[in-house]
Amino acid sequence: MKFTTKSRYALNALIELHLMEIDGPVKVSKIADMQSIEITYLEQLFRKLRIAGLIDSTRGRNGGYFFAKDPCKISVKDIMIAVCLLYTS
């Protein structure tokens, strides 16, 4: 498999999510700022990752994204399939 911009951004964003999730759900804007990614682009990637069941989200003032399953059990292949192959729109 070849890394695409989508897969590279998604992988880096999930690493950032893992590092920040200790304090609770993480806002996509915070990850976008840390990774210098357009927020709208990252929101599209996170939507695909959520549909694939890799992450989940909660609404509200303290809302944000968090892992839906153990991050140690998520493979690079899972991420690439979620953002590059499945759920294209």
Residue ranges and their predicted role:
Residues 5, 9-11, 15-37:
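N-terminal helix-turn-helix DNA-binding core of bacterial DNA-binding proteins
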Residues 40:
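Key DNA-contact positions within bacterial/archaeal DNA-binding proteins
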